[in-house]
Amino acid sequence: MRTQSLKPYNANYHSLITRDAQERVDAPTDSGLISELVYSENQPAVAQLLLPLLQQLGKQSRWLLWLTPQQKLSRLWLQQSGLPMSKVVQARQINPLSTVDAMEKALLTGNYSVVLGWLPELSENDRIRLRMAAKLGNAYGFVMRPLNETKLDQGQCATLKIHSSLYH
């Protein structure tokens, strides 16, 4: 497993997002995908759902990138999960607001079969940017977002979370 820090990525996104971009990104394709997963600490099922896909993607020649601003991946969990340690890259200590930019840049490179990013709520523009980047880079992107427990108290339906045992 490799760990690295990323500096904020700034670019002109107007070249990626045009008036027709929404149609192109939302059209069914066989290359690239962005999915948002809202998860709860009390329900570790998302890890079990994602693990087979991550194991399959680990068989590709490309890297698996984890953009985790606050957390450090557990080496023990990676070993026990069957993910290829030599293909896992973790970028930490990223400003959470810069993580969207880092995720977009990583998806665009085509060097990663999957990019998992722990991100705040996305704007529609951010979603479009990430979908386009995933499509162009032929990669999977998983936007991981912790469940806001106060919203749960206000009647929002319970959703799944990746359990914190994945981290030190």
From Swiss-Prot:
Keyword Cell division: yes
GO biological process terms on file: division septum assembly; DNA repair; negative regulation of cell division; SOS response
Region (Lon protease binding): 161-168
Pfam families: SulA (PF03846)
Keywords: Cell cycle, Cell division, DNA damage, Septation, SOS response
Induction profile: By DNA damage, as part of the SOS response.
FtsZ binding: region residues: 106-112
Superkingdom: Bacteria
Keyword DNA damage set for record: yes
PTM comment, free text: Is rapidly cleaved and degraded by the Lon protease once DNA damage is repaired.
Marked site: Essential for degradation by Lon protease: 168
Purpose: Component of the SOS system and an inhibitor of cell division. Accumulation of SulA causes rapid cessation of cell division and the appearance of long, non-septate filaments. In the presence of GTP, binds a polymerization-competent form of FtsZ in a 1:1 ratio, thus inhibiting FtsZ polymerization and therefore preventing it from participating in the assembly of the Z ring. This mechanism prevents the premature segregation of damaged DNA to daughter cells during cell division.
Description of how the protein assembles with itself and partners: Interacts with FtsZ.
UniProt record similarity statement: Belongs to the SulA family.
Protein name (record): Cell division inhibitor SulA
